């Protein structure tokens, strides 16, 4: 994601294995997609003020160069940069619900409806189910792990789907019992999730029901309130 910092774990030809500061997640990126930071220490990075983009945003700098960046991208606070659709300044992210707004989560989820599915993606150019959820909570000031099964370890368990509220997370498992999908609850009967694309579907105690096909697509395992 644009503006996120990381450390290099491995290097092979024109590819780097990196570990992100935000969630300690590892993956490969092309060396053409990074810029080395020389004027800030690693210890200072987490406390640096960031402006978070609330939609697909065009940023421009003092040299009149512009760049489109995704919802959830981080821009270092600077009087040399201007942009529209900025949500707020976030000095750090913690596992805390103090800044959490259910309406904010649902509103942002609806903005992303129709975004194509991309395994490993977490931007408006393509995202998977856990990347979608992580991005929503990041914009609300909440740090969640990258993978669905780790996200399911956070929060408080809600016993019944009828008790679910907007902003809760519904998790689903496969035939082996492993959690492999997550969706944002928008009310006790509907969720928004990334499956083929970011979409709205019905949910009940069995799982996600696709009204177009008349079939259940994901089996409900647990509901959590972060």
Summary of predicted features, one role per range:
Residues 2-5, 12-14, 20-115:
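Boundary regions of SH3-family modules and the immediately adjacent low-complexity/disordered segments
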Residues 19, 181-186:
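Short beta-strand-centered aromatic/proline hotspots
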Residues 36, 158, 186-226:
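Aromatic- and glycine-rich peptidoglycan recognition patches
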Residues 42-57, 135-151, 186:
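Short, basic/aromatic beta-hairpin or loop at an interaction surface
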Residues 117-166:
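Catalytic cysteine-centered active-site loop
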Residues 122, 173-181, 194-201:
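Active-site loop architecture of trypsin-fold serine endopeptidases
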Residues 163-175:
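Hydrophobic/aromatic-rich core segments of domains that either
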């Amino acid at each position: 994601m644009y503006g996120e910092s990381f450390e290099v774990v491995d290097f092979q030809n024109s590819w780097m294995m990196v570990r992100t500061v935000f969630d300690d997640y590892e993956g490969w990126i092309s060396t053409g997609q990074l810029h080395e930071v020389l004027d800030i220490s690693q210890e200072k990075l987490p406390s640096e003020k960031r402006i978070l983009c609330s939609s697909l945003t065009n940023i421009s700098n003092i040299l009149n160069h512009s760049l489109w960046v995704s919802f959830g991208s981080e821009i270092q606070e600077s009087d040399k940069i201007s942009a529209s659709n900025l949500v707020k300044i976030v000095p750090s992210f913690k596992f805390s619900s103090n800044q959490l707004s259910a309406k904010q989560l649902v509103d942002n989820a609806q903005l992303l409806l129709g975004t194509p599915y991309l395994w490993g993606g977490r931007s408006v150019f393509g995202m998977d189910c856990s990347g979608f959820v992580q991005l929503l909570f990041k914009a609300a000031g909440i740090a969640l792990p990258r993978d669905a099964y780790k996200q399911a370890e956070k929060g408080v368990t809600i016993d019944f789907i009828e008790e679910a509220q907007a902003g809760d997370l519904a998790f689903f498992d496969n035939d082996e019992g492993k959690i492999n999908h997550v969706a944002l609850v928008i009310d006790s009967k509907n969720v928004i999730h990334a499956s083929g694309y970011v979409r709205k579907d019905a949910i009940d105690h069995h799982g996600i029901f696709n009204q177009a096909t008349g079939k259940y697509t994901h089996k409900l395992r647990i509901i959590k309130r972060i």
